Amino acid sequence: EACDIGAELLLSHRVTSMERVFNSENQFTNWKIDGRGNEFPIECRAVIDASGVAGAASKILDMKTEVEVIAGFQYEMLDVPNDGYLDFYLWPKYSPHGYVWMIPKEGGRANVGLVTTDKKGAIKYLEDFIQDTYLADKPKVNPPWRKDGIKIKPFGGTIPISGPREITVDTGVILVGDAAGFTSPLFEGGSHLALWSGREAAQVITQAIAENDLSVKRLMVYQKAWLKRFPPYNKILKGKTALYDLTDEEMSIMAHCLPEELGNMSPLQKLGIGIKILFKKPILLTKRVIPVLLSFGYSRAKHFGW
């Protein structure tokens, strides 16, 4: 759709250098971008970096920010029962410091995958989960976008988990989505954040070009906007750390104390949950279960949806 209204899509192109061009008054005017591909070099007024977890612009321009990553892989499977819900499992046996998912799609198809801090063992954990559950006899297939004849294998990669990069704007450039580190550090969802940040960046860049001002100060409007909108990552990270300190039994007890919807709870409802936990397993309150519950609330789809 974007191409229909003027965008140009260049496949098999890889950026290797980005050079700022300045006028005689030392004011930034445009970019000269080079790389591997027939259309290079390319000149443009501004750059929105949506290069994913690699963060191309951040590395090429040495913006002095790094992100921690987690491994995420999934299979596409067939004949998977679909009750209309997404299944998520906090199951350390199969996904240390992560979780497993089953995301149903049309026609009995589903994406079954996991994220874990154990990047080398991720695919083995996924295979074990499928083999040990109701999915064992379900056929695996390659996703539609993969070429015919290729061996069936999981697809995925790394996902940023440490929160936003400290710097998401610079002269003439804005980082969005995974390139900016925008994923939930608890559940690693990032599609909602990528869509929101891409739209916000486009609006800010459009206005900045109209004003002929692509300075850091002008583009900082974007960074202020996401800082205001996104929930506090540091609180979610505290909750995540506390969550993975719980045993399987403690997680189950906590889950049975929760309502179906964690958002918009009144202070009285929150107190009620605390009382339930106190009676069922008092030690949970000493294991910082409250930050866990708060991080669940912050990580609802309203804020960090897929």
Which sequence ranges carry the predicted segments?
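Repeat-unit-sized solenoid/scaffold elements
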Residues: E1, V115-Y125, S197, N264-G274
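Conserved FAD-binding subdomain of flavin-dependent enzymes
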Residues: E1-D4, Q203
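Predominantly flavin-linked oxidoreductase catalytic cores and closely associated redox partners
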Residues: C3-P144, P160, R165, G181
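FAD/FMN-dependent oxidoreductases across multiple families
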Residues: R14-S17, K120-V204, I209-A210, V216-M220
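A general structural signal for short secondary-structure boundary/capping elements
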Residues: W91-H97, K119, A136-K140, D148-I152, ...
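A broadly tuned preference for mixed-charge, low-complexity surface segments
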Residues: K93-E106, G157-A179, W226-K240
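C-terminal helical "tail/cap" subdomain of flavin- and related membrane-associated enzymes
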Residues: T206-W306
